[in-house]
């Protein structure tokens, strides 16, 4: 819901009309908002007559506009994709006019990758990399000040299960949950990556984990679009290389 707060701020500007497009992964938080529509990201290129395109997703097909803006959600140089997909990622980012990043460290990391792949014949106008600070952190800080719900809970929040499979927690989730439930007095909150919830095959696995532990009063699976309640309730976070570690800290 932090992106919606940004949209509300933009709407305060005169003579700006904001239209929101969403896909399956973002439908729950956006579909009931005013002036929204569902779209497959591959069809973005058919959208015409807009002045600014703003996205917190990496997209590979862009609408026709002179101002294409991508807001990166990482606070540090966490991996974005597997190495074999990195070339296509940089190619897509090079289509942007502006990329909003959270720190100089992230800017230097992205510049290094862009320079690396420019040597491999990916040639296009370079986007402007702008240090905006960590916009999401402002949102989290304000929300957490309102109400603290801290419980004796452990939050288990891995990254997207299909990213860098040799290093993420995916195959260890079930034994970790079992070990924590059997050997601690903590409540366990398992929060899957939103991208896994949107993946139909992975969703079946998530539901099977939920079915396995749902009768345990100390287990909860969190599919909410906002992670703030789980942040508030937990004293400990278990994750892998997900950027959520920095947000949580």
Model features per residue range: what roles?
Residues 58-72, 79, 224-249:
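A donor-sugar binding/catalytic signature common to diverse glycosyltransferases
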Residues 1-141:
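Active-site and donor-binding regions of nucleotide-sugar-utilizing enzymes
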Residues 1-2, 27, 60-61, 75-77, ...:
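Short acidic, S/G/P-rich loop/turn micro-motifs used as interaction or catalytic elements
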Residues 2-10, 135-208:
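Conserved catalytic-core segment of nucleotide-activated headgroup transferases in glycan assembly
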Residues 17-33, 181-223:
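Catalytic donor nucleotide-activated moiety binding site of glycosyltransferases and closely related
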Residues 30-36, 75-82, 164-167, 214-220, ...:
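Short, flexible loop segments at the rims of nucleotide/cofactor-binding pockets, characterized by
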Residues 50-58, 142-155, 230, 235-239:
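Short, surface-exposed amphipathic charged segments that create phosphate/polyanion-binding patches used
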């Amino acid at each position: 819901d932090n992106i919606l707060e940004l949209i509300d701020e933009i709407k305060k500007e005169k003579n700006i009309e904001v239209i929101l497009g969403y896909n399956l992964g973002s439908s729950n938080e956006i579909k009931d908002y005013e002036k929204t529509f569902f779209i497959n990201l591959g069809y973005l290129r058919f959208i015409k007559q807009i002045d600014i395109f703003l996205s917190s997703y990496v997209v590979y097909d862009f609408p026709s506009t002179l101002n294409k803006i991508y807001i990166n959600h990482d606070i540090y140089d966490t991996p974005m994709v597997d190495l074999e997909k990195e070339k296509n990622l940089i190619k897509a980012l090079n289509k942007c006019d502006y990329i909003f990043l959270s720190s100089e460290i992230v800017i230097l990391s992205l510049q290094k990758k862009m320079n690396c792949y420019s040597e491999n014949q990916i040639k296009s106008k370079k986007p402007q990399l702008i240090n905006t600070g960590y916009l999401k952190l402002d949102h989290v800080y304000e929300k957490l000040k309102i109400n603290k719900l801290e419980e004796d809970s452990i939050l288990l929040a891995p990254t997207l299960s299909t990213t860098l499979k040799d290093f993420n927690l995916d195959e260890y989730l079930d034994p970790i949950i079992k070990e924590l439930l059997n050997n601690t007095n903590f409540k366990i909150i398992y929060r899957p990556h939103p991208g896994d919830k949107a993946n139909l095959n992975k969703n079946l696995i998530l539901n099977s984990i939920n079915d396995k532990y749902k009768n345990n009063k100390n287990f909860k699976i969190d599919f909410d679009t906002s992670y703030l309640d789980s942040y508030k309730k937990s004293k400990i976070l278990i994750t892998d290389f997900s950027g959520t570690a920095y947000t949580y800290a």
